[in-house]
């Protein structure tokens, strides 16, 4: 059996351990202190036996969710090369999911679109300062009829007009 394979693995493990110890040394004393305090409180909670004070059912899920969320964030931050201090910076920031948006009060459009259009056109006419205070919807109807008549006559004229070629 070749023992050189095991020595290579041992060297890799030792290098990884040195890298991890350097990361711990580079982190601030404050973050190490917080980490040790968290470990102590976790150990106290694990070792405590006996009746616990009842907590409301609403507080427990929020606390667990917050803890899981911060652990997940801490894990992601560390993967990106950050530290626990970076987690503290973003701890109070709310995500988009937590923000509540209020829907603006919008007027529901009327079932009959022509009434709404006529009202908007009436307001537009008032803003432009026309002498009439209200828009006459009948004018809209006659205008559209005039346009269709013009279109019909122009299409008839274009069909009846012969274009002479340069054969003469």
Swiss-Prot record:
A GO biological process held by the record: ribosome biogenesis
Composition skew (Basic and acidic residues), residue ranges: 34-62, 103-114
Question: Where found, per UniProt?
Answer: Nucleus
| Amino acid composition bias (Acidic residues), ranges on this chain | 82-102, 159-168
- Give the principal location in a single coarse category: nucleus
Q: Where is this region: Disordered?
A: 21-114, 136-168
Annotated keywords: Nucleus
Give the CC-aspect GO terms.
nucleus
User: Which positions make up the signal peptide?
Assistant: none
Q: Which domain of life is it from?
A: Eukaryota
Protein name per Swiss-Prot or TrEMBL = Uncharacterized protein C589.03c
